[in-house]
Amino acid sequence: MKEKFDLVKLLNILKKNIKLLLILPAICLVVSTALTFFVMPDKYTASTQILVNMKKSSSDLAFQNVQSSLQSVNTYTEIIKSPRILDKVSREFDGQYSTAELNSFLKVTNQTNSQIITVSVTTGNKSESDKIVNRISKVFAHDMPKIMSVDNVTILSSAHDNAVKVSPIVSVNLVISIIVGIVLAILIIFLKELLDKRIKTEEDVESQLGLPILGSIQKF
């Protein structure tokens, strides 16, 4: 019975503050919309896929060759991000992007037990993301045989005007802003109730003062 009473009391508190519950999420939504469309910069990601195989010798078995390539994938990913590759890419862009900037744009990943490396570049310009990721992949494919014992570096897929917008994600930002607004409104409502020590109901007299109710005066 007490749980039911507490729930009713809780709902009454929320109902009493319904304006705040509606206004604060609306304000957060407007602010988020403004930030998303007018402040937050767009980001575009373009990707390529690269396959690297080790050099074969007459004594190597195909399985051993694949296993060796798999074990070397982590090394290849680090080489792609190394100054040896990125310095050259920076020079080919006539210094438009520094090595540090290129490294900040770059993400290199691979699936477990796969020889395929995915190279991704994220910038604020769709075409530049395409150009940079393609150039990094080409430099890596050209220089890799000189760095390690590989003779077959294949660019499986290049970026051709296929950069994808990755941020800001409008729907996610708007949903989050509404949730934040509701949470803030509820916190403010209950904080206000906790700090309000006024006695407003008969139940408050019994719970806060510990006194029995002898009678009540009706409102006219």
Curated annotation (Swiss-Prot):
Name one molecular function that GO assigns to this entry. protein tyrosine kinase activity
Name the membrane topology term: Multi-pass membrane protein
UniProt pathway annotation: Capsule biogenesis; capsule polysaccharide biosynthesis
Q: Matching Pfam families, A to Z?
A: Wzz
Signal peptide (UniProt feature, chain positions): none
* Keywords assigned by UniProt, alphabetized: Capsule biogenesis/degradation, Cell membrane, Exopolysaccharide synthesis, Membrane, Transmembrane, Transmembrane helix
Where is it found, in Gene Ontology cellular component terms?
A: plasma membrane
What the entry lists under InterPro entries is as follows: Bact_polysacc_biosynth/exp (IPR050445), LPS_length_determ_N_term (IPR003856)
Compartments, as annotated in UniProt: Cell membrane
Taxonomic superkingdom: Bacteria
Q: What is its main location?
A: membrane
Gene Ontology biological-process annotations: capsule polysaccharide biosynthetic process
> Which parts of the chain span the membrane according to its record?
20-40, 171-191
Could you tell me what this protein does?
Required for the biosynthesis of type 1 capsular polysaccharide.
Q: Which family does it belong to?
A: Belongs to the CpsC/CapA family.
PANTHER family linked to this entry: FERRIC ENTEROBACTIN TRANSPORT PROTEIN FEPE (PTHR32309:SF13), TYROSINE-PROTEIN KINASE (PTHR32309)
- Name the chain's protein: Capsular polysaccharide biosynthesis protein CapA
**Gene name as annotated:** capA
